[in-house]
């Protein structure tokens, strides 16, 4: 019986390709971060972050399906929850002096922490 071939998962992994990384994760972070210098309304800032998190969450969920990247199974839903929370802040349902910065910070920290299981169990949930 042959050993599992990891190159199949790696070749499908958008996070391991500069173009995929740029499109799905770097670009939306830059767009979200640009709200701090564009002097937009609070609601616009929140909805831009909601869109950025939804974009990244979609990239993670699609990547999890493509290559079974472990942290994408975790960060995809976390980013979508952040998108929903940011939209709720933008619509005024969630309020507070630091509501948006809290949502953004917590979402980004959760997405970063989703890499920890890969350090324990490996990069991919299954080997193709």
Placement of each model-derived feature along the sequence:
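Short, Lys/Arg-rich, polar N-terminal cytosolic tail immediately upstream
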Residues: 1-14
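Membrane-helix boundary elements
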Residues: 12-44
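Aromatic-anchored segments of alpha-helical transmembrane domains
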Residues: 31-33, 81-89
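Structural signature of hydrophobic alpha-helical transmembrane segments
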Residues: 41-54, 76, 101-109
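Canonical alpha-helical transmembrane segments
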Residues: 52-68
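Cytoplasmic-side transmembrane-helix entry/capping segments in multi-pass membrane proteins
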Residues: 70-80
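Membrane-helix boundary connector in multi-pass membrane proteins
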Residues: 85-105
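Membrane-water interface at the C-terminal end of transmembrane alpha helices
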Residues: 110-128
